[in-house]
Amino acid sequence: MLGVAAMPSTLALVLKKILIANRGEIAVRVIRAAREMGIATVAVYSELDRDSLHVRLADEAYALGGQTAAESYINTEAVLNAIRESGADAVHPGYGFFSENPDFARAIAAMGVEFIGPPPEAMDEMSDKVSSRLAAVRGGAPIVPGTTEFAQGPDDIRNFGNEHGWPAVIKAAFGGGGRGMKVVKSADDVDDAFASAQREALAFFGRDEVYVERYLTWPRHVEIQLVGDKQGNCVWISSRDCSAQRRHQKLIEEAPAHQLADGIEEAMGEAAVKAAKAVGYYGAGTVEFIYQDGEFFFLEMNTRLQVEHCVSEMITDIDLVEWQIRVAAGEELPMTQDEVTASRRGHSIEVRINAEDPAEGKFLPSPGRITKLVPPDGFGVRFDSGYLSGDEISQFYDNLVGKLVVWGRTREVAIARTIRALEAL
């Protein structure tokens, strides 16, 4: 165990010490927010992360052992042991790893430790795309035409496509990031696509259930950031446009979403809040929609803090991690919907900086030592990272080096500032 003196807690009667069950930039982000609130922090680390930035910044740090994520950050018993040894009274899961695992949330609740996230029952309901679609319908959110049950075989796909038209898309019910997703252009392609989607879903998510829905040919990916409290209040913070993707993975995000038809952003926000309330949601969450031809449809709900939460923070001056912690401590939301709406100003853009090799246009992960990292700065520029010069990027973890986040009074100013900052990186 590594340690330094902890700061006094401003929430001493509720939360005295938070363990961050994660690594990299999100662990650093949570540590900094907790430090500003006067709450002691605990890091956990694999053997490869012993000297990482999040370990250096935390008040205490506990070894999980192992190198891979399976041996360390998603080794349930190792993480639970660190919680016991540290005496932490709350756990922030970050994103990825245990962040959307209701069984983990239940396990730490059984220890008398607060999970800084939504109730496990809400995670259960939003954890697969089929049950989340049903929850959205209960909340009055429009959904893309599709099945509300798992597809039992290729015939279900063919019947749907023949009724609703081609192309259709087969999706992994328990997945995301484009894994287990297959676009089917005609009935002749169904058998191969169904088998491929199931294989990929099982390999990446441990479950092979799939469902089918109408395929929108050129949709935009627009999402709503929201936060709810344990008293039943819920507000939406901002919209975000995450349409700039590669291999179904986000690269550039903006807030607010631009060039939406009149009233669409507000309607999305209201639909997101209704969907969250339908499952008794509290904490930070994101409802994703697809938008095309003036219509929007519920896609899924992410029951965690998103990588791109920063752009919503930049246009509202709301610290979403602080809000997460305060909600977990039982506090009511500090702002009403009208106050949140009035706080929005300007435009923000986030660009993900990844360690990749662009050779032959493949952009494959490129682990190794960072010889020099000089973050850009200047007015309206923020750089969130879990690395410093000399740190090592491991092949076993995500290759995200950092997030360049820029604010401007208009979208045009934000774009110009982003270009300037990228040139300086």
Describe the predicted segments one by one.
Residues 181-183, 214, 260, 400-409, ...:
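Short, well-ordered beta-strand elements within core beta-sheets of diverse protein domains
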Residues 333-334, 338-398:
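Glycine-rich active-site loop/lid that clamps phosphate-bearing ligands
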Residues 254, 260-294, 302-359, 423:
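Active-site "cap" helix and flanking loop/linker of ATP-utilizing ligase/carboxylase catalytic domains
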Residues 277, 390-402, 406-407:
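Cofactor-binding beta-sheet edge motifs in enzyme active sites
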Residues 196, 200, 229-260, 303-330, ...:
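Extended active-site and interfacial segments that coordinate phosphate-rich ligands
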Residues 2-8:
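Intrinsically disordered, low-complexity segments enriched in serine/proline and basic residues
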Residues 8-287, 291-306:
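N-terminal beta-alpha lobe that positions the nucleotide/phosphoryl donor
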